[in-house]
Amino acid sequence: MMVFVVFVMCRYKILEELGDGTCGSVYKAVNLETYEVVAVKKMKRKFYYWEECVNLREVKALRKLNHPHIIKLKEIVREHNELFFIFECMDHNLYHIMKERERPFSEGEIRSFMSQMLQGLAHMHKNGYFHRDLKPENLLVTNNILKIADFGLAREVASMPPYTEYVSTRWYRAPEVLLQSSLYTPAVDMWAVGAILAELYALTPLFPGESEIDQLYKICCVLGKPDWTTFPEAKSISRIMSISHTEFPQTRIADLLPNAAPEAIDLINRLCSWDPLKRPTADEALNHPFFSMATQASYPIHDLELRLDNMAALPNLELNLWDFNREPEECFLGLTLAVKPSAPKLEMLRNVSQDMSENFLFCPGVNNDREPSVFWSLLSPDENGLHAPVESSPLSLSFSPMQQHTVGPPQSSGFTMTSSMQPNMLDRPWMAVSAPFQQSHYL
C-alpha cells in the first residue's frame, strides 16, 4: 500500500530571519499559494505528540482569544517532530518605533496606542488570561494598528498559584513580582501598561533598573517607599532590608514627563501603584478621563498669527537611546519587520513657544484680504484633505535566499546614537523635555 505524505511547510518560502530567542526563532515568509506574507515561529524543542502541541500555553491562549488587537494565529503545523506557528505579519514593534523617533509622540498618538492595547488586554482578562510579559517589544504595529503578541508566558487566571518567579522584562515587572510573590493577579499587566504609557511620553523607560534591587530602588525614587500595611508583599523585602531604612529623593512623575497632560499623569500614578488592588482594570482604565480629553487650542488663532513672523528654526532633539539587553531566560522572538514608513510631506508651521502643544497646517493657497489663514489641525482623520495615511515601503516578495537585515535608527539630522548604555531619567530629567509634536494619521 502506497502512503502519500503532504508536507504543509512546503507551502511557505522563508524570506528572512526576524528574531531568535530561547524558545524558538521567527522568520518572515510568504505563502506560495496565496502570496500572503506571514511570520513563522519555529519552536526549538522537539514535539513527538500532537497533545504536547495543543497543551502549550501560547496555543491554548491564542485559540481562545480572537480580537482585533491581539495577534492572530493562523495555523499550527507539526512536521518531522518540529512545531511551527503561522502568524499574521506585522511591520514594526513599539520598541523600534520609539527607538527611531526624533520627536515625542503627540497626545493623540499616545491615546490611540494605549486605547488599542487596553482593548486587547480587557478582552484577554475577560476570557481568563493575563499576559505577564507586556513590553514595547511585544506590541506589534502596522499602519498605526496595534496588536498584543508573544503569549509564551500567558497564564490562565483560574490556574492555581504559585506562579513562576520569572515574568516579564525587568523594567516592566510589577513590585509584587520583583518581591517574588507567587500570588499575583492580572494587575501585573496593568503595572506594565502604566510603565509603557510613561515611556511613550519620555521615549525612555520609567524604571530602568540594572538589577532587581536597582529596579526596586528606582521605583522607590519615583513612588516613595511602599505602605507596609496596605502592601503585605513588601514584608518579603527582607533580602534587601536596607531599602526600608533608606531615604529616597522624591521625583514626581509629573516632573519626569513635563509634556504629559495632567490626565495622563493621573492615569500613570493609578496604574503604577504599589498596591495591586488600587490599580484600575483594563476596562476601568479605558473609562479614565485621559481617553475622553478634547483637543484644545493652546493659544487663540490671533495670537498664533502674530507669532508666525518670528518663527525660528526648529531645534534638534538629541535622543540618547539604548539597546535592550536580553536576559538569558527571555523568550522574545521579535515579530517585527524592518520596513521604514514614508512620512507624508505636509508644509508645517509650528509655534516656537515651549508651551505650545499643537501643530498647525499653513495653507498658502487660502488667503483673505488681510493675512494668511491658519487652521488648527483638529479635524478627525476621516476629513478630506488634511491627513494623509502613512504608507509603508513595498515589501520584496521575491523568492530569494534568506537574508539578514539590520534594524537601526535612521541617520538623519537631530538624531544621534550617543551610547549603548541605558540613560537614567531620574538623573537626567532633560531627556523628557517636550518638543514640537509630530502629526499622524490613524487608520
UniProtKB/Swiss-Prot annotation:
InterPro entries xrefs: Kinase-like_dom_sf, MAP_kinase, Prot_kinase_dom, Ser/Thr_kinase_AS
GO MF assignments: ATP binding; cyclin-dependent protein serine/threonine kinase activity; protein serine kinase activity
Keyword terms: ATP-binding, Kinase, Nucleotide-binding, Phosphoprotein, Serine/threonine-protein kinase, Transferase
UniProt-listed Enzyme Commission number(s): 2.7.11.22
Gene3D superfamilies xref list: Phosphorylase Kinase, domain 1, Transferase(Phosphotransferase) domain 1
Residues annotated as domain Protein kinase: 12-291
Phosphothreonine modification, residue list: 164
Record: residues binding ATP: 18-26, 41
Active site (UniProt): 133 (proton acceptor)
Catalytic activity: L-seryl-[protein] + ATP = O-phospho-L-seryl-[protein] + ADP + H(+); L-threonyl-[protein] + ATP = O-phospho-L-threonyl-[protein] + ADP + H(+)
Pfam family, one: Pkinase
Family of the protein in this entry: Belongs to the protein kinase superfamily. CMGC Ser/Thr protein kinase family. CDC2/CDKX subfamily.
Functional note: May play a role in the regulation of plant growth and development.
PANTHER family, A to Z: MITOGEN-ACTIVATED PROTEIN KINASE (PTHR24055)
Entry protein name: Serine/threonine-protein kinase MHK
Organism of origin: Arabidopsis thaliana (Mouse-ear cress)
